Amino acid sequence: MLRRAALVTLLLVLLAAPGAAALSIPPPPDRRVNDYAGALSPAERDGLEQQLIAREATSQNQVVVAVFRSLGGESLEDYSIRLAKAWRIGQKGLDNGVIFLVFVDDRKMRIEVGYGLESKLTDALASQILRQDVA
């Protein structure tokens, strides 16, 4: 009986561990370029910020860049979806936001697209952009 209780306790600890180790989500940003890794110079960050603001003014679509040091073992897909749900980039009701995520140490990138833009910026196109234009 004691052995069974120990096994159940161990199982519960192991099941709870992935959630406890999840990378934290920063609060929704007030900038378009968010460099949590310190990878961009102030001039690079500000220049990109101005480009994204200008693009948003003409397209009405909101693009946000988020640069992190590492995923800390979390999957890229899981973290990007959690971040997108927390930040809610884009206009309310249109869901026309895009988050470009970069994880410097992991050498991983992802483009997370709001539902309102999925017909224009498909997963295939986002993947092509990452392979041909960014990498």
Residue ranges and their predicted role:
Residues 1-5:
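Positively charged n-region of N-terminal signal peptides that target proteins for export
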Residues 6-17:
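Bacterial N-terminal signal peptides
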Residues 21-135:
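Folded, non-transmembrane soluble domains that reside on the lumenal/extracytoplasmic side of membranes
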